[in-house]
């Protein structure tokens, strides 16, 4: 708690009493290390746009005094990333008010053109091709990634990642659950995205 004493604002998540981990593995610190790394990677992906300061001051997230840096699943600054034109799709919310869903495709570089840092930023080489597809953001927070929503993957899409930004006013249209971990793409959007 002292960590926040000199800060203007902040939140601390404190984990204590790891009796289940201790009983299951016997080595609490080794298991916590695995969970810590997985948690840091997850947060670095989910909140990457906030951590990188997109459109605002960068957010700071620390895991055991380690400051997280945002990943970049689109490798937007890589010289060989093909950044395609952003399109905006108007859609009416449940009250009939027009909202905008923005869509921007990226074609990522071939693996041979990636540095070790590029591989880390894109989410790891083991996920490089497996996690191609749509990346759905709700208010710049990543909620779904690496899915084609049932669309067949082919040679033309093997390096494609598509950023889709939706406002929170479309939660009900997208079927976003309370945990912000599930969404169902509306037919009007699916038809436009899969063209």
Residue ranges of model-derived segments:
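Bulky hydrophobic/aromatic packing residues
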Residues: 1-4, 8-10, 15-19, 70-77, ...
């Amino acid at each position: 708690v002292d960590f926040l004493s000199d800060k203007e604002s902040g939140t601390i998540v404190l984990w204590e009493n790891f009796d289940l981990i201790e009983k299951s593995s016997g080595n609490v610190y080794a298991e916590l290390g695995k969970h810590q790394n997985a948690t840091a990677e997850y947060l670095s992906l989910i909140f990457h746009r906030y951590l990188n300061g997109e459109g605002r001051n960068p957010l700071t997230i620390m895991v055991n005094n380690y400051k997280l840096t945002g990943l970049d699943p689109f490798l937007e600054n890589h010289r060989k990333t093909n950044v395609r034109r952003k399109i905006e799709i108007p859609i009416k919310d449940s009250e009939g008010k027009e909202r905008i869903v923005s869509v921007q495709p990226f074609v990522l570089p071939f693996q041979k053109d990636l540095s070790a840092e590029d591989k880390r930023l894109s989410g790891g080489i083991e996920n490089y091709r497996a996690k191609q597809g749509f990346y759905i953001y709700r208010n710049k927070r990543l909620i779904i990634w690496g899915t084609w929503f049932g669309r067949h993957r082919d040679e033309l899409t093997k390096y494609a990642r598509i950023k889709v930004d939706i406002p929170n006013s479309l939660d009900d249209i997208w079927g976003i659950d309370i945990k912000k971990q599930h969404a169902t793409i509306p037919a009007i959007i699916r038809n436009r995205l899969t063209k």
